[in-house]
């Protein structure tokens, strides 16, 4: 009589199937969460680029104004130098933001498993 053995095998197969379903569902949820987090990071990085671009433009305008003030003698070299330093920092922050944006796009591409950016037509 193999009734109990057969019943145990059936139950074991059912449990294994259910476990596989749960593992698959857990993996789907993990992947979905990873993709959502990567997408939110891209959105945040894009907003950072916009903010840093505006800051860079303001610093550029401030340097232009300070240069003109220095030219007509109503500003000191120290003030001009400070405006140039602020402009350089704003340029650097903008470049860092651009780099961060591309990093976040690469992370999103890795999460979804496909390339999201188009090729530029170059040799790369």
Regions found by a protein language model. Name each.
Residues 54-114:
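Short segments within alpha-helical structural elements
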Residues 5, 43, 118-124:
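Amphipathic alpha-helical coiled-coil scaffold segments and their short linker/junction regions
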Residues 1-61, 96-99:
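Sec/SRP-type N-terminal targeting helices
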Residues 47-50, 107-108, 114-116, 120:
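Short leucine-rich amphipathic alpha-helices used at interfaces
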Residues 7, 77, 117:
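Short, electropositive, low-hydrophobicity segments enriched in small/polar residues
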């Amino acid at each position: 009589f193999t009734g109990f053995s057969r019943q145990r095998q059936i139950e074991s197969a059912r449990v294994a199937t259910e476990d596989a379903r749960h593992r698959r569902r857990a993996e789907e949820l993990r992947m979905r969460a990873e993709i959502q987090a990567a997408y939110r990071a891209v959105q945040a990085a894009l907003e950072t680029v916009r903010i840093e671009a505006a800051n860079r433009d303001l610093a550029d305008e401030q340097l232009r104004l300070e240069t003109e003030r220095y030219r007509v003698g109503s500003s000191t070299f120290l003030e001009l130098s400070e405006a140039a330093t602020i402009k350089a920092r704003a340029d650097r922050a903008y470049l860092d933001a651009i780099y961060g944006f591309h990093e976040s796009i690469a992370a999103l591409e890795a999460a979804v498993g496909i390339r999201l950016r188009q090729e530029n037509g170059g040799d790369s």
